[in-house]
Curated annotation (Swiss-Prot):
Lineage: Bacteria, Pseudomonadati, Pseudomonadota, Betaproteobacteria, Burkholderiales
Superkingdom of origin: Bacteria
Keyword Oxidoreductase listed: yes
GO annotation terms (biological process): L-proline biosynthetic process
Coiled coil (residue ranges): none
PANTHER family recorded: DELTA-1-PYRROLINE-5-CARBOXYLATE SYNTHASE, GLUTAMATE SEMIALDEHYDE DEHYDROGENASE
GO molecular function: glutamate-5-semialdehyde dehydrogenase activity; NADP binding
UniProt similarity note: Belongs to the gamma-glutamyl phosphate reductase family.
Broad class of where this protein is predominantly found: cytoplasm
Enzymatic reactions: L-glutamate 5-semialdehyde + phosphate + NADP(+) = L-glutamyl 5-phosphate + NADPH + H(+)
Pathway of action: Amino-acid biosynthesis; L-proline biosynthesis; L-glutamate 5-semialdehyde from L-glutamate: step 2/2
Protein's recorded name: Gamma-glutamyl phosphate reductase
Gene: proA
Keywords annotated in UniProt: Amino-acid biosynthesis, Cytoplasm, NADP, Oxidoreductase, Proline biosynthesis
Amino acid sequence: MTEFDLHAYMTRVGQQARAASRAMARASTADKNRALLTIAAAIRRDADKLKAVNARDVERARTNGQDAAFIDRLTLSDKAIATMAAGLEQIAALADPIGEISNMKFRPTGIQVGQMRVPLGVIGIIYESRPNVTIDAAALCLKSGNSTILRGGSEAIESNTALAALVAEGLAAAGLPSEAVQVIETTDRAAVGRLITMTEYVDVIVPRGGKSLIARLMEEARVPMIKHLDGICHVYIDDDADLEKAVRVCDNAKTQRYAPCNTMETLLVSREIAAKALPPLCRIYQEKGVELRVCPATRATLEAAGFSGLVDATEEDWRLEYLAPVLAIRTVDGLDAAIAHINTYGSAHTDSIITENYTTGMRFLREVDSASVMINASTRFADGFEYGLGAEIGISNDKLHARGPVGLEGLTSLKYVVFGHGEIRT
């Protein structure tokens, strides 16, 4: 595709998406739900076909030398397929936010002022090796009355194309415009450059991918973005922690899956409880093959308990998102030091405290400056499906518009509506 042809193609996609967004904004809840449920049924019906198509993408990725974390994100397992279908049904069951009027106020002038929830318009989704994003993005944009332009990675092209066909089937069944969900058909990277600068057609970009992709888009995009750059998540074990809870939560936060952005990457332990908390937990980590990168105080505690095979942590380790069986561990001087560490080195994604002290826990919630902050729970819960959003289109660690897992409401905005009886301003 020549540069001229690409520009013309992307312009056509943008124009069609803008036109479809107007139709989607007035689509009924019943029609949107009909489309979602049809897609869910089609995914279950074609599960074996989807796995066969996905297997070809996975085999190519392995041949190209992609690592285990990449392959994990790319693979459509039985569980992943079931989760996609369940997510569609959960989104269909959610209340439709579009048209909801809130914050009504009666003014002394006689007018009534409120806010109405409306779609954002056209949402561009750029993602790499996660074919499930095709469904999550289409579903959330559809239910929230938006149209969407999907640009998946070339490594998942067959999986994305197969899933997009099922989305088209659902739209047709509900009488909704096929252009409401469009997949960019070219793998030319210049298409991304055009998509992120089409301010006349695209209202927001949501990137789902690695750090290099997000960094590039932050430099080049003219369209606003909902994004997060890193998932450097922490769990802090407080002086007043229940040790059984601490071991269970911290084990899950790190080892349930290594690839997701809500996996714990740094464990912080209060010096007062380190000798009791670290040995049983680190024994589990080493049994599961997790490399432990430790500060000097943590090394001393673990070596006194008979541990070996530890790696000295560097300053860089506190800033790393490993997405692998590697964990940084730091012993800190209590709550103040833990909060300071998280706010200095963290990525404002998700952080958790293990404590039985209510005051300590509430202070952690207030002072840790992250999109999701937890007490006695695994960071792995920072997910749209687990939060009851049905699915998420992404996670934002920005502070404007949307923060944390972005579900339906994150894809809408509020406009002011005024009701009068002929009032004039004097």
